[in-house]
Each structure stands twice: as C-alpha cells, then as structure tokens.
Curated annotation (Swiss-Prot):
Any one GO molecular function term: zinc ion binding
Protein's name according to its UniProt entry: Zinc finger protein 418
Name of encoding gene: ZNF418
Major subcellular location class: nucleus
Keywords tagged on the record: Metal-binding, Nucleus, Repeat, Zinc, Zinc-finger
Organism of provenance: Rattus norvegicus
GO cellular component: nucleus
General function of this protein: Transcriptional repressor. May play a role as regulator of the ubiquitin-proteasome system and autophagy-lysosomal pathway.
Pfam family, any one: KRAB
Amino acid sequence: MKAKKTVGSSGSCVRAPALSTEPMAAVKHLAQIPRCTETGMICTQGCVTIEDVTVYFSQEEWKLLDEAQRLLYLDVMLENFTLISSLVYRYEAEAEEKTCAQSLSQTEAPQVRTPKQGQLRQKPHPSDICITVLKDILHLNDLPGQKPYLTEVCTKPQDHKHHRAKNWLKRDVDSLVKSCIFHVAGNPFICSKIGEKFPAIWNLLQPKDIPNGEKQNKIKRGKAFHRDKNNSESDEYKKSSSPQHRLHEYPGVCSAKGGFESNSCEQDLNKYSPAPFRMDQTENRPYECHVCGKWFGQKATLRIHQRRHTGEKPYKCGECGKSFCQSSNLSEHCRVHSGERPFECLECGKAFGCHSSLLRHQRTHTGEWPYECSDCGRLFRQIVSLITHQRTHTTEKPYECGQCEKSFSHKATLTVHQRVHTGEKPYHCEACGKSFSQSANLIKHSKIHTGEKPYECGECGLCFRQRATLMKHQRTHTSERPYECRECGKFFKQYFYLIEHRRIHTTTEFYECEQCGKSYTQKATLIRHQRVHTGESPYKCEECGKAFEYKSRLKRHQRTHTGERPYECAKCGKFFRESYNLAEHQKIHTKAKPYHCDQCGKCFSRRADLVKHQRVHTGERPYTCGECGKTFSRTTNLVQHRRIHTGERPYECDQCGKSFSQVSTLTRHQLLHTGEKPYKCSK
C-alpha cells in the first residue's frame, strides 16, 4: 500500500498519512478522518484535493478484502468524494464571481476578445477527477475483458452554476456506483441490509419519483439481465439512460448468475433501483417523507401520507365512532348511514356510495374477470377477493379475535365478528329504526319496506327478496335434499337444518321437556316447545288481541286482517297466504305424493303429513293438555281442546253474531242462514 503526494490548488503540498499495512486498518483510518462538527466536512490545513483523502490498495491487498470490507471501503470513499467535490464547486463558483466583479470594476465598457485557436482551455471537471480516482482504487481498469461503464459526460465547458454542478456530480457518482458495485462486492448480497451498514451507498439507492411519461421497467422473477459487451460505450450509455433499461444498471446485485434468488431480493431491487437525478424533482416535489423516502408536491399531502406510518386517524364518524386518516374516506363512509348513493350505473341504474364500488359493479356487465389465482386458475373481479381466496390454499387465518381467539382469513370478517362481543350495530334502518351489525343485513331488511322482490321462481312465478331464499324455495319443486349427514346419512333441504341435526351426534348435553320427555339440542328450542304445555302465547295481535306461541304464526295471522295473499299459483292463478300452502296446492297439479307409509302404503304429498299419519299406527300422542291431562296426536287438536277450558270462541257469525270455538263449527252454522244443503244421500 502506498500514500500519494498531491498538490492542492493553492500550491501547498499535503501528504496522506502513512497507514498500516493491514488492509482494514486503512479503511478504519479513512473513516476516522477529522471533520467539522457543524458541517460534517473534512477539516485540513490548507486546500484539500480528492486524492488527499484517498487510500490505495495494491492488487494483492485488494484481494484480501472480503465483501463487507470492500463495501465499507466504497461507502467511506463515496462520502469523502461528495464532501470534497462540494468544497471544490463552492470554491470555484466564488472565485469566478469574484473575478467577474473585478473585471467589471476595472473597465467601463467590456471588450469582447475572440480567443485564438487552442487558446481556450477547459478545466477538468471535478467529477472527472472523482471518477478517475475511484476507478483506480477499485481496480476496475484491471478487470480482464471489462469496459468501464462510464462515459465522458463532463467534457462540456464549465459554465454551470453551483447547484447545477452538484447535480452533475450526483449523476456521475450515481452512474459509477451502478456500474461497479457488483465488482466491489464480488458476491451477491441482500439489498435490504445496505442501509444498516453503508449509509452513503444507501443514499444513492433511495427511491426517486420518476417524471411523467416515464415508467420503470418491471422485473420478472427468474429473468437474467446482462450487458452486451459488443455494444459501444455511447450506445451503452444511451440505453442506460432510457427508462426501459434503467433497471439493467445493476448487473448481478441480487444474483451472481444474473437471476433472482428470492422474492424479497426481487422486491428490494424493484423498490430501490435509482432513477436519474433531475433538477425538477425536488423543485416540483420538495416535501420528503423521512420514513419511506417518498416525495410530495404539497406539505398537506405529506401530512396525510405520514398518517399511514403513525396510524393517526383524526376524522371520526359521529354515528358509529369509526375513524379514518382522510376526510374523503370519512365522507364515503357517512353515505352508509345517510343512504346517499351518488354514483349510478348507466347500464342498470343501480347506485353506489363510492366510485370504486361502481367500477367493480360495472364488471358484472362487461364480464371482466382480471384477477386469476395461480394455484387453481379461478378468476375474480376484485383483487381483494383473489387475496382472500388464496388463503383457502394456504389455510392462512392471520386475524385473531382477542375475546374468543377465533381466527379469520381477512380483517373485515374479524371486524364484523367483534361486533358479536361489543353488541355494536352501526347500520340503522331509516324506516323503522332497526339496527344491524352488517351492511348486507340492512340491505336485505330495507327490501321489506320497499317491497322489492327481484328473485323470481321459474316454476311457479313466486318472487323473493333474497337469492338464497329462492334457491331454498326451488327445492320444493325438485324435492332436492343436497345436505347429507355423514353420521347417519340423513338428507336435508337446507344447510341450517343439517347443522341443527348434527348436534344430535356431537352434543352430549340435551335439554329434556319435563312434561312429555322430548329432548332438544338447544335450550331456546325447548323453551318454545314448553309453550305447548303451558299455553303461553307472548306474541299478541294488535288488531284482535289474539296471542300466539311463535312470532311466525302471528305474522301469518295478521294476513287475515290485511287480506294479503302474496303467493300465487302459476297454473291456476289461485292466491295463498302462506308459501307452504302454495307448495301443497301445486302438488294437486303435479299429483306428486312422494312420501309413502310403510304400514298401509298410503301416500302423502308432504313429509309432515306422513309423520302425523304414522301416529295412527303407533298410537303416539305427544301433546298433553295442562288442565285435564288429555293427550292428542296433533297440535291443532290440542289448541281446539284448550278452548273448552278457556271458553274462547274466536270464530263469529256475521249474520247473527254467534261465536264458535272451531272454524268447522262456524261453517256448519252458516248453512242455517244460507239454506244450503250440500250433503246429499247417495241412495
């Protein structure tokens, strides 16, 4: 190793200090060169040149340095070169301004003198000196068969201002690092670890905003990038300056053979590949994020961006308390509560609360499925759906509930689930004030008030509010039972019934009725059943005061007052109050009786009728009167019997006002007023 003697611009000689023969001792000494405490610049007596802070290694010493030592050496040299070059530019700029001022003061009228040929001499650009020295100490010229990946970019007359000259230096050193970093390391290294140990290199690799009209070339995994050695220097420089070849300027950084070895390395290279330095970058985007290095044109935009790193959400919804980092996101969210839908689809007229939802909806008309699963080939309209679907292949459930430790595949499902514990119901119906924990349930509920029933059955013409209800209804025509119990082989029409049935096999605790001994898997089902014995009827009709054991029966009863018959038979046009009455009626047209009694061979159109009929053979009477203990095989018979004890007579004659406990008795009584005699003796 040797120390060179150099001469500064002022003529004073400065010799680099004598260093140890150990290679890394020289690097450590170079990193400890004294600097100014205020500016961080190198402090020396007199004028300092670039070579004054340069340590040279011989070929033998260079080979002794490992990868980390070479990168550390390069990092220290880059920092020193940047500081020295800045001093040179500042010194030359001040000297030139001083010379111009003196010449103007000495003569009243400036005289223009044409220089003779060869008289005009261009000063060597400081970056040329920097590049020459750096190429020398890194032994780039000694590599066999390698052309230096540098061009003479600084041969123009030195008429640049100070800030423009700094930009030239930035571009030259940046180009040098791109071309030689692999030769310095000798082996592949991980991009994400550069910033931890080599800050000067890291500053050159920080992401830059690319000007409009330029796009970075996308790097695909497994593809190698090699420079063509046959190309000339000028062609090579032109290609390297174009945006299409900008990412090729890091040959072998992530792989010794030119290919990527890992996804993380590919992402790091794609993220931190530097773009050429431009003066208008910092002028048009002067505000930089210190966390990720992104630049912004306005300070307010930077503040909004920084909330992603800090997690700050200053905009809070007054209805449900949900917080957002941007006011625009809050405005979109408030439309959930207000029901405002300003974005309308031109195809079908459907409206949406935000523009992104409209764009996703429009794909249903265009048939576009742009996102494909690489594992199974399934297509999706939304990238969120693809990400959620891909977790079915990995069984990944990263979102865990802190209350019950249940895991979910995506965060939205976890948020909805947590409302089970908190009882939160942020979605309110404007018509009736009812609240819901999910927006989908509110949409379904709102159709009750609007009367919208968009899903129509092709067999009978019956319409439904939900598609799932239509699919369940269609099984009444086909008698399809797609849900099978793996334990006993029993089939069910609905998945809900299968889940209820499975508890028979899995549940060890049953809820037994003390009156009749019947067992149930759920306590709520037992409570509903006990109303049969106790006669409790908590649901009361506001019109007539009649009470019912179940809410569903109250709804069906209320149709007797309103006269509503929403279920129409497509064959004969007859209307019915209940869907099951329509289903039974339709079997008259089809004459289908799929349920057979094993005892007598009698056929029935409904399974429930078969169960009731089988009690004739078994003698089973599961329904008992709480007053007298009399038993019945059907609930309707028990209800009619109770009226003997209560004295209830709900069926009144319109002609004479007489009341009856059974509708059949009222029908026979009305024959007295009409004089009708429908029963004729066949003999």
